[in-house]
Amino acid sequence: SRRQRQMCIRDRYNPDIMDAAKVNVLPKVEEPSVSKKEVEYATFTTPATSIPAGTIGAYTGKEIQPGFIPGYVRLGYGNYGNLDVLANYLFRLSDRDKLNVRFQMDGMDGKLTMPETDTKWNAYYYRTRANIDYIHQFNKVDFNIAANFGLSNFNLSPVQPGKQKFTSGDFHLGVKSTDENYPIQFEAETNLMMYNRQNNNTFFFNDKVGETQVHTKGLISGAISDEQSINIGLDMRNLIYNKDLKLADDLQVYENRTALALNPHYKLSSDSWNLRAGANVDISFGSGKSFRVSPDVIAQYIFSDSYVLYAQATGGKLVNDFRRLETICPYALPAGPILDTYEQLNAAIGFKASPYPGLWINLYGGYQDLKDDFFEVQEEMDYNNNPSLPDGDGQGENTPSPVTAHQYLNLEFSNTNNFYAGMKISYEYKDLIALSAAGTYRNWDAKEKYSLYMKPACEINFSADFRPITGLNINLGYDYIGRTKVEGIKAAAVSDLHAGASYNVFKGVSVYARINNILNKKYQYYLGYPTEGLNFLGGLSFSF
């Protein structure tokens, strides 16, 4: 991952655009941390060339350090109509009250070359996000209230005609205990979340559908010694849809349901050991398997201050609500009932070491088992034989001319598993240089082999950050994702060589620029959807 330094916007949303391959259910290994380091937020931007990205989480207030600069504005533009707008301001109303306001818009509008046919597509994709967050610090409890709004506007490919709009909004209330002297600690939150999809699968139905979700989370911890605690976590989602949308075979696409997750676990934190031993107990009402259990075990052994042996066995349910469907593949349409994905097991072992100051080496390997894992598939539909479409009677009469068959990108499900192994090396020298290289290999298997077509088989990442003089930051990076071969066919690998720089021209004023896909490679993050060729973005940022 790129190491980008340092902006004082204190929220938990990374302004970088996430690669599409990073937002699904690929294995997550709990990499141990020997010493805590304060999070640094980026002034350097990654342009919206791999949109869409993960949805924004609510801002959560953090302790503000002396000399903190509360305001930040960033404006950038590039070829392919790449747009980058970000504004954030943190109002310090008092020593106990803070209000954060944020607005972000990114996107693109340009001609892309379709794979296989080489035809031009006038593509556009714009995302707008607005957030407001307030936190009050009582003597022993923090109170948090927040509201978030999101809007995504984009069009579908020429072989899948149409456009789409996602509108989301949510309201958040939360409390968290802060007095560490108390033997009982707690945190709780509830979220009222709305989401609307304007258009759906035009071959089966074309109607707006709304999702209302009440998401409640809680954690209570009881200390049994200075190093040990017993904890119980709860996560409950109630999902309600405003319409009964059914496919041609009378299958319900979105089902009202309740997903309840309980997470009892024991924790030990000492100079040499970090242990977490528990279970994920998942209960479902209204859809899917009603009862599942998976482990929640993490063990880390630290020796010689900078050497760590670690192992994990984790799992749990991934609720496929509208927000997650957008991050997985916004272009895909439901071809059957939407099921929730379950990670039955993610087991890994690893070794992390720092044999030299600033140098870290991390080796790991493991196995992951997924139930009802998503995959994308293209289906060709004959426009003339669907009476539900406008101007069609199902007999080939009164149909648009010329006669066409559209390829719809659909979401389907399959049980998958993979063995994986990887290594990461990083090196930092003072505040002048930061280097990192990582590689991961995965061996996938599934009953439906074609479901693995877009799965990553090999990932390689390299990043180099330099600060040769005060105020100048230079970054060079490379991202590679090799796809899984299915029946002798393999999708083109993602190969993105990118570079960028930012320079502090005046106090509080910086100029930045970035170039992506320098090699001008053709690849896809989503099946059948091209990405931009060589592209650049530049602009100004202001802190005040």
Residue locations for each model-derived region?
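Outer-membrane beta-barrel translocator/receptor signature
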Residues: 52-57, 64-73, 77-117, 122-130, ...
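Exposed, low-structure sequence patches enriched in small/polar residues
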Residues: 68, 73, 274-276, 282-286, ...
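Surface-exposed extracellular loop regions of Gram-negative outer-membrane beta-barrel proteins
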Residues: 93-113, 231-240, 244, 253-284, ...
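Outer-membrane beta-barrel transmembrane domain signature of Gram-negative proteins
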Residues: 169-174, 189-271, 451
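Outer-membrane beta-barrel proteins
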Residues: 93, 132, 136-140, 173-181, ...
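Short, small-residue-biased leader/transition segments that mark boundaries at the very start
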Residues: 5-9
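Short sequence motifs at beta-strands and strand-loop junctions characteristic
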Residues: 67, 77-81, 120-126, 163-167, ...
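Flexible loop and strand-edge segments within Gram-negative outer membrane beta-barrel domains
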Residues: 108-115, 119-129, 143-185, 189-213
